[in-house]
Amino acid sequence: MKKVRRLLQWVGMSAIFLASSPFLLLADNDVKVSSETLPGQFAFVQGDFEKFQAHHWIKKNYVGGIENFLGEYNNPNFSTSMDSRAILGNGDYEGVFVMTKGPWFTHFNYEQFRKYYSGRGGVYHRFTRFSGVDLDRELALDIAHIEIETGRKINENGEISFSYEHEFKDGAKSRLTWTPVTEGAVTRGIGPSWQEIDEDVDIFRLKIEDEIKGFTVKGEQSLELFKTKSRRYERSLSTNAGAVLATVNQRRVRIQDQVPEGNLMSSMLELNRWSFNDKVFSALAYRFARLDVRELENLKEFDDLLNPRSLSANSENKFDARSHNNMFTHTWVMSLMTFPWNVVNIGSRFKAELMERKGGSTYPGDFTDPPDNVIDRTEKSSVNNKIKRLGQAVTFRYKGIPRTALYTDFELEEVFNDLTENRTSIGRTPSANEVFFRNTLTPSWRAVGTAGGNFSPWRFLNMTHQFRIRSYNNNYDDRRETSSTGTAARSAFFDELDIRGLEASSRVSLKFCRWFQPSVRHQWRDTKYFTRVENQGEVETGMLSHVYTFDMTLIPRPDIFITGSYSKDQSHTQSERAMSLVPTFNSGVDSWFLSILYMVNEKIHFNGAVLYSHADNFNDFTAIGLPLGADFNRVDVTFGCKWTPRKNFSLGPKYEFYHYGANHKAEYGDYNVNIAGLEASLAWG
């Protein structure tokens, strides 16, 4: 598969450059070409370059290439256009190519980018050795999407097309499954972990659209094939030495291999039409989907010297574990939109969905220390899941009041989930703790109501206000469950979850004059969480947040354009009712931004921007757990100049500076970065 991926990747990048060749060779009035290049950019990094790359998606050292290449060719019988980008060294490639000849058309799209990750774990400032541990490897994931579509216009309103898509992910990323780190008698989950990923997706799609007796008819048939190979690495760390089992367990290594693969087949049919002199729009759609997935998993445990071991009480040596799941869904959607008067718009939508899922798995385990590759016990599981989902929505818009627009929306969803689980334990040493049967009926509902409006009582004043209420309830009802034969007999013990939220936002904009236009915005959210588990009292938790934003546009002279903003984000989280001590958490971030554009003359332009963010949220909860809260200072500065000696040619040197300084009691990874680069653009035709 990697050979196929490399071939498609080569074809995609080659198409970007080859498609540009005709535009460079053709020289007549029908051709328009422009190019913006980055001959060179160099990032000088002092400090944690991995965190810098993860924050800004900019690779250290040198990158360069084509930032944007546009080409267009038109004549009565044939037209083509392209838009491409290729930054070497940063894994950033993009190309869009469109060609039409008569009723035939072809679209080609290629996009690839690289996402960077920091390999640093968490921080516990009371540790002297293993706080903020960093992996000894760089983590980056290349993500790409290739699509080609070709088709033909059937008539003025209809067309048929076939497309092929390929997506892949290749590389490694950090994971938040942080490992246990032990110093003395204290253990905290702050050790870094990472995962290798090799994923391929192929999608084949056939689409047809036409108009039949006033109805627009759309049909689509697709087949998606996917396969992923991943390997997760987790290493526990400890300052305690020795060969005692408990001490060796503190330095264990776990490696997990997972290979899920499957296919998704779906069919969709949609009908819609306008009627009653375009005052009523109605639509009906149906979708059928079938998902079939298989997975192979191996989980192995080692000591710190990578010798195979079975160290933990519930050994994590699982060999050749397999699962097979399939799911069927039927979805119906109906919508109706009416315009009874010019100032009124009423819409409604209804959705019904039936879903059935069946699955089974085997989980073999080797509990001998060291492992002897003989399966001691196998857990066999099966699941049967039936879900019915209904959804309704109503919208109302009114513009009958001068300088005013009012709207309201209401959404409701009901879900009925019937889940049957069955697990048995077989083998040389079966475990009664792993045997259980349960049937659960889980009804849930969700409601969202929104009301708001836009008001302009005077030309210089514009106001927008919105209020929203949310409610969600999930009642877990175990209709039948085997009696507990041990601590692990039940896979879940939740009884109920209830979430209620209120939101409001307001924005006021002033336009007293053209050269100065300020605006103020306030966003408020109050959310309550009510949870209840078996044999325990209800826990109530709440989060209250405020976001204040001030924006400004200033044009003191025709050749100077200034924008600025200030944002203050505050949140407060506390458990008002709980069975144990849960500390209150307060957080806040202040951000300032300023940008300036100065046009000296038609040939010389200067631009600059400054961003400063400050977070002071360190909450020292080390006595009962990990410290919480982001605590940092961040500065981003950009400065550039654009010189246009000729109408179709320009040069632009640029400079950027990035600073990140964290409170080392909460986070590690400071950096200072200086970036210098040169941009050039050329247009002809």
Task: Describe the role of every protein-language-model region.
Residues F23-A27:
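Sec/Tat signal peptide C-region and signal peptidase I cleavage site
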Residues V11-P22:
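Bacterial N-terminal signal peptides
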Residues K2-G12:
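Bacterial N-terminal signal peptides that target proteins for export
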Residues D28-S34, Q41-G685:
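Gram-negative and organellar
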Residues R5-R6, A19, K647:
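Intrinsically disordered, low-complexity repeat segments enriched in small/polar residues
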